[in-house]
Amino acid sequence: MSKTRVKRTLASEYFVIPKKAALATDVALCEQKIIGTVDGRDCSVYVAIPFCPTRCSYCSFVSYTSKKLLSLIPDYLIHLAADLEKTFAAINELGLRVKTVYIGGGTPTILTADQLRFLLGKIAELTDVTALEEYTLESGRPDTITAEKFAVAKEYGVTRVCVNPQSLCDEVLHGIGRSHTSEDFLRAFEIARESGIPYINTDLIVGLPGDSFKTFSSTFDRILALRPENITVHTFCVKKAAEILRQSSDIYSLRGGDAGKCVDYTQLKSQQEGYIPYYMYRQKNTVGNFENVGFCLEGAEGRYNVYMMEEVHSIFACGAGAVSKMVNYQPENGGKPVIERLFYPKYPYEYLRDESTDEKVEAMKAFYRAQRLI
């Protein structure tokens, strides 16, 4: 089916408005190129660092900021390293190929340079990082980024970092509890570029409290001028665990036209500047019910994002709050994936007492044997 016919079908049979039909079609075509490289022996690894310097008021992720919990980081890394050893050993025993590694959080660069060296060094011991399609360090908060940390990341083979401002309006940043300024972001972005790490992602959020079309479009224009390889545009979403729900009931002030104008602006301007949409997903309770879209320069797609969202291969996760997703996407299943999940304890204290990794490894092996993948 041609691209034109796909868009026409989405519009006529599924009542998708033309601009969204075009967006969905463009994303699908880009994802097809990536998904087409996957087979049943491929997998990725997610490494959870669930600590942050402060907690954003809209955040509902597993992340901890108190000094008492931050003091757990040294012990956490030792426990995490042991779990990674067992997980990678199982991956090797099963004959799987690791395509991507993603270190997320939380804020992974809350680790010191020495702690980061310990973690990245351990991963380098366990897998050939030079053979990875992509190796991401989700740095996130600009106020945790230093040249020394990114030098360590580059030394150990990291190919993609995330430097996430969310907004370049200081009033908006202050209002959502971010402990950095727009200048801090610009400094961190320069550090990332000078590090020689080839791919930089920046996250932005449409519809943050106190934001407007004027301030958001200014933010987006400034980001475009920096030419990051990836720009991920999220629509503001508040979940039950978010602090902002206790602060104000008026959190969807951009429910109407401004949010839509901001979303449309990102899609128009990104295209004009040579970016293409490569992945997309929806969440509940977003401002204006809009989508989250990842844009990239040609050839700079964030491959882990596609593998994870489209559930085309297994992702083995280690760390507090981490969830492994084992996937069999073989033709004999009629095109429908068989998916099983394995959960680590949510809280760092519980994780440090957890001894279930051996059970998870056996579950991994049982899944692949049951699906006749080994």
Predicted features along the sequence, with ranges:
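Flexible, acidic/Gly-rich N-terminal and inter-domain linker regions that tether
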Residues: 1-42
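Auxiliary Fe-S-binding modules of radical SAM enzymes
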Residues: 1-6, 238, 249-374
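Short, flexible hinge/linker loops that cap or flank conserved catalytic cores
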Residues: 37-41, 50, 95, 129
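Canonical Radical SAM [4Fe-4S] cluster-binding loop centered on the CxxxCxxC motif
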Residues: 40-75
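Broad gene-expression machinery/nucleic-acid interaction feature
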Residues: 42-44, 160, 303-305
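Conserved non-cysteine loop/helix-boundary elements of the Radical SAM core domain that shape
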Residues: 63-266
